[in-house]
Amino acid sequence: MKKKLAIYFALLSSVFVAVSCSSSEEELYELSPYAMVKSFRIGNIRSSYPSFTSTGEDTLVVRTVSMESFGFTIDQVSGRIYNNDSLPYATNVSRVVTSFSVDGVLSIYVDSLDSYEYMATTDSIDFTSPRKLRVYAADAQYYKDYTVSVNVHQVEPEMMVWNRYQAVEGVSPVRAVELAGRMYLFGTDADGAPVVAIAATESEPDWSVSAVSGLPAGADLGTVQLFRDIFYAVADGDVYSSVDGIVWSFASAGAGAAAIVGASDVDGKLWIAGEQGIYSSENGSEFTFSESLPVDFPLYGISLASYPLNHNKNIIRYMLVGYANEDKSGEPEVWSRLSTEGKWTNYKNEDNKYACPALKGLAVVRYDGFLYAIGGAGKVSGFDVEAFKSFYISKDNGIAWKTATGFYQRLPKELFGSNVPFAVTVDSNNFMWIINSGSDGAVWKGIINRLGFERK
């Protein structure tokens, strides 16, 4: 399709000379002095994209990406032509069919020839790197240069990327909580004594391990929660607090509390529950009775979250997932409460085919606006599942839980089948932390690429 521009202009001039000679002497024909790209678009692209098989093996699938939603901007001042919305990750742009509308004659710079060569307005072009175009006016007295870039995501926005760091030596994880840019990992040492490991969240974790003091013997570190930048836990039916996670002190008689079941700085409430009922506090030391303990209300193996409603940021939703029995057997319970309501609501429905998964060590965190459940081996929708095989995600605030089927949001393969204590949390920089122990223990930090983009 490419021809020497000189030949093209010579032919173009001869056409106009011929027209002039066959017309009356009073008729004049002028070649256009304009040179510009008026519109640009590309055709649909068929490419191979990463995916995975039903058994979890990596594979490729071929699909066609429609270009209708990817418009191009033509900046006539700078001469740049580009798409604001990048094409999907892994899209092949080595042979792209184009469609130009121009005033003038279009040419493209060819590196191997070190010159601009004529091109048709519907040629296919390699856009793996920006291409230089030049539009000559038909009278060959003027030209304008353009640079065309077809932007493609260099990383898959929806991919969850994991980094592995060394395990926290000598600590069996129970609960992980972030405060002021530091991660606090509560657990036990080899003798079963309570300890806390602390590390900065921004860099590779460098853990400092300290013995926990001030809590009664046998205190359940799984009850630790954060409220108004202070750590709280329940032990022997009472409430204890700590400003540094290391030294703890008595905060309030907890009316036989067995667990902290809700905490929200926005709503200004800390919730505890036990056989005597559910209580709330605004300062962590004075608790007010709210309601009697409902049947099947979870008190053990607690995971909780609190967040504003999408349609009204002034209303806080409390989510609570756990077990009503101390041995944490059977199906987990899912309860919720709005800050404007007076009672907690049980989400259990015997007809629900997508109930919360019953996993060993079940942990639930809120991530990317949804609830993520992970854990050891167990049952999901009545079927046996391996430990850490998948995320189970609820997009309707805890009612339906479905296996994450997307190729990109997967747990690290190294965790598959793991059967050791672990702790899970999400930090303020959108990283999910999974900390496990044992001979293959590690600290995993994962993030969906898109959430990392939003930080920049």
PLM features: what roles do these ranges have?
Residues 22-174:
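Predominantly extracytoplasmic/ectodomain segments of secreted and cell-surface proteins
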Residues 415-456:
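Blade-level signature of beta-propeller repeat domains, shared across WD40, Kelch, NHL, RCC1
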Residues 165-191:
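Beta-strand-rich domains and repeat architectures in extracellular enzymes and scaffolds
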Residues 140, 188-193, 277-279, 323-329, ...:
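Short glycine/acidic-enriched loop and turn motifs that connect beta-strands
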Residues 197-202, 241-243, 280-282, 337-338, ...:
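Conserved Ser/Thr-centered positions that define the repeating blades of beta-propeller domains
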Residues 17-20:
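C-terminal motif of bacterial Sec signal peptides marking the signal peptidase cleavage site
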Residues 180-186, 228-233, 267-272, 312-321, ...:
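Entry beta-strands of beta-propeller and related beta-repeat scaffolds
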Residues 168-177, 213-228, 253-268, 294-313, ...:
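Repeated scaffold domains used in trafficking and secretory/extracellular systems
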